Each structure stands twice: as C-alpha cells, then as structure tokens.
UniProtKB/Swiss-Prot annotation:
Full protein name: Ribosomal RNA large subunit methyltransferase F
GO molecular function, a single term: 23S rRNA (adenine(1618)-N(6))-methyltransferase activity
Enzyme Commission numbers on file: 2.1.1.181
Domain of life of the organism encoding this protein: Bacteria
Top class in the EC scheme: transferase
Protein role: Specifically methylates the adenine in position 1618 of 23S rRNA.
Organism name: Desulfotalea psychrophila (strain LSv54 / DSM 12343)
CDD domains, sorted: AdoMet_MTases (cd02440)
Catalytic activity, as annotated: adenosine(1618) in 23S rRNA + S-adenosyl-L-methionine = N(6)-methyladenosine(1618) in 23S rRNA + S-adenosyl-L-homocysteine + H(+)
C-alpha cells in the first residue's frame, strides 16, 4: 500500500469539537472552583471579565482553575521558570490524537489498555493529565530534566485521580529520544511538544513578540500561546525543531513494530515537506499532518506509522 498523506482542515478559530475549552472562558464557574482566581479578574471596557494574560501569576492561577474544574486535578503547582502551558491548545492535540487512534481502533480507543508515550513531559505534566482524565489512557512521561520529573511526580502523587495512570521516567542520555526509554515496551501513541527554537536568543525573541502583541491589546483565544517561562530544553535545541524531529524520525525506525503511531507537534509549516520526505525514505506506510485551530493561530502535528492497518 502506498504511503498516505493526509492534511485535515479545521474550521477557522475553532478548537476540536470534544475540547471542553471551546468558546469563552466561564470565569464565574472557574472562580467557584478556584476562589483564588477572583483576585486576578479584570473588567474590560465592554463589561466582560478577563485576566491579564501577561501576568504569569494570573495565567498560572487560571491553569489551576481549568485543571480543577475540567480534569479534577486540584493540586497542580509548578516552580517559576518552567513552562506554564496553554490548556486549551494542549487539549486539542490530545483530542485529535484520539481521533487518529480511533481510525485504527474504533471500539477500543479509550481506557487504560491504551498506552501513550509523552516525550518531554516537563514539570507541568500537562499531556498525561489531560489524556488520562479525558480518555483513561495510561501515560509514560519522559524528560531529560530530573527536577521536572520530580515535580511532575509530585503532581501525580498529590492527585488521587492520577495515581496508577501516569508513569514518569528520566531520559538519562540527553542525546537520545526513544532509545533508552521504549526498550522492549509497546505503545499505541507517542507525542511530543518539541523545542521549537534553534537558539536561546531565538526563543527570547519569540517571547518578546508575544509580550508586544499583548501590549497592543490582541486578546483572543490565541493569548493562550503564552509560555513566558521555560527551561532551555523546553524552548530550544541546536538546529531547532527540524533537527530534533529528524532524529526522532530516524530513531523511530528501531521501534517500528512497537508503536502504532508516532507523532509530534510541528510549529513551522516549511518543515512539513522535508519531514514527510524523510519519513517516506525511512519506510513509513502512513503519514498524516493534522491541523488544529486556536483563535487566529493554526498549529499542526505530524504523525507516522510503519503499519498499514
């Protein structure tokens, strides 16, 4: 069978239909769930309620409220300097992966038998939280940062609803991605939010642009792109995402029979074609590019499989 190359279009500005974060935030409901959010509420000239998305403490508090309200995770805290992820956009990746898996397993794409590997889980542990609470999947989260693994582990331990659903594992060799992690294991999915930037300077410039946009009042669902924190490994690597994902693709060959679908977010559209070309050369049977909309921003992930089913 020839390799399949799918590019799914999305309705402009709309999150996945199953994403509970579609539409405006219900800040009143979130404040009832997390009363501390009240101190960060501001009133716009229109009379609508909002928060200051350039205020790291306000964004962190909003995340705690969202996780408690929608995912029953009431104990979530990350130290200053680590990524404070945009919950709605992160949830979209999970829901579109669920669609991808359901194409292969229409009657059994939920539950603890589904095993997902999250590369670069980070201290926030956000993908395992959303995936396990939304679909009951079992996650293995990895990171090269021992402190990130420790903090994520504390989050899992502090929330009984996550116990037994999330396993955390440090990647001891910073030069490797799958090797030393998958070993003899098997997974239905792998996922990754890779370091997008090629240098620290590029990462800092990106954050400055986000701050500038907020300063000009561009407040919409795209404001959730804010990631003003971040350790070096979370934000950049030599060569940027294309180098990282080429290595990921090449390493995936060794685990072709152990993983149903490999996947990763892909921030730069220009990187799609060279990655698809490489994946074809590596023998992938199925390659898909799935677009996701968050406000005015279109993001995407690339997924590949060495099986034809």
């Amino acid at each position: 069978m020839a390799s399949q190359h799918d590019k799914k279009s999305v309705q402009s500005g709309l999150l996945h239909p199953r994403n509970p974060h579609r539409g405006r935030y219900d800040l009143d409901a979130l404040c009832r769930t997390c009363p501390e959010l009240k101190m960060h509420i501001q009133i716009k000239p229109t009379g609508d309620k909002t928060i200051d998305f350039s205020d790291a403490k306000a964004v962190l508090c909003l995340n705690r409220a969202l996780l408690a309200h929608y995912y029953q995770v009431s104990n979530w805290q990350i130290p200053e300097g680590y990524l404070c992820p945009p919950i709605p956009g992160r949830a979209d990746y999970i829901h579109y992966l669920a669609d991808l898996l359901a194409e292969d397993l229409p009657t059994s794409a939920k539950g603890k038998k589904i095993r997902v590997l999250d590369i670069g889980t980070g201290a926030n542990c956000i993908y395992p939280i959303i995936g396990s609470q939304s679909y009951g999947w079992h996650f293995v989260g990895t990171d090269i940062d021992p402190l990130a693994i420790k903090i994520a582990g504390m989050i899992v331990q502090a929330n009984s609803c996550l116990n037994g659903k999330i396993t955390l594992k440090q990647q001891l060799d910073k030069k490797l991605i799958f090797k030393g992690i998958i070993n003899e294991d098997k997974f239905d999915l792998t996922m990754c939010n890779p370091p997008f930037h090629a240098s620290l300077a590029e990462a800092e410039a990106g954050n400055q642009r986000k701050r500038k946009n907020l300063g000009h009042g561009k407040e919409n669902r795209a404001q959730e792109k804010l990631n003003f924190g971040g350790q070096n490994a979370e934000l950049w690597c030599p060569g940027g995402e294309i180098v990282f994902l080429r290595q990921m693709a090449e390493e995936s060959v060794a685990f072709a029979k152990q993983v149903r679908w490999f996947s990763s977010l892909l921030s730069k559209g220009k990187n799609v074609a060279p990655l698809k070309k490489l994946l074809k050369q590596l023998g992938c049977k199925r390659i898909k590019v799935v677009e996701m909309a968050q406000g005015q921003k279109i993001s995407r992930f690339i997924a590949w499989s060495f099986s034809q089913e």
